[in-house]
Amino acid sequence: PEGTDLMFYEGLHGCVVTDDVDMAQHVDLKIGVVPVINLEWIQKIHRDTSQRGYSNEAVMDTILRRMHDYVHYIVPQFKSTDINFQRVPVVDTSDPIIARDIPTPDESLVVIRFRRPDEFGVDFPYLLQMIHDSWMSRRNSIVVPGGKMGLAMELILAPILRKMLGK
């Protein structure tokens, strides 16, 4: 809306904090969207072999080469996110190297964790009512069916963004 500042950033380093950089300090609403690591690897292996023509071995070499950065720069960002959406498959993903298919949203659950739910006025009873088959796993976390992730994002983020933009 006119007279407001809204910047949307999507990428790996939106909340990165190092000795030289502190991106997190500049962000008003930090949202993490991350699959569990085996699902992340399955997605990468599938994409890089089927769409980019790499061999399984080349993709695994890339994953292993990037592991230090993943552990030291990517993962630590999630401790400062306000809301995390983590997709968790409910099918066997124990060996991502041999997985033939990427689990579908309907073969997944999404764990949504709020760092400080009171700060954003999260209405858990409303979310539980609106998102069929959802439940609370902790006082600040709700679990929703994978196919309802878009609905959950809309129900959670729309009121937060309206409030932030002064509407």
Task: Locate each region found by the language model.
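Phosphate-binding/switch loop-helix module in NTP-utilizing enzymes
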Residues: 1-18
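Short His-Asn-centered micro-motif
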Residues: 9-12, 33-34, 87
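Inter-motif core of Ras-like GTPase G domains
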Residues: 22-34
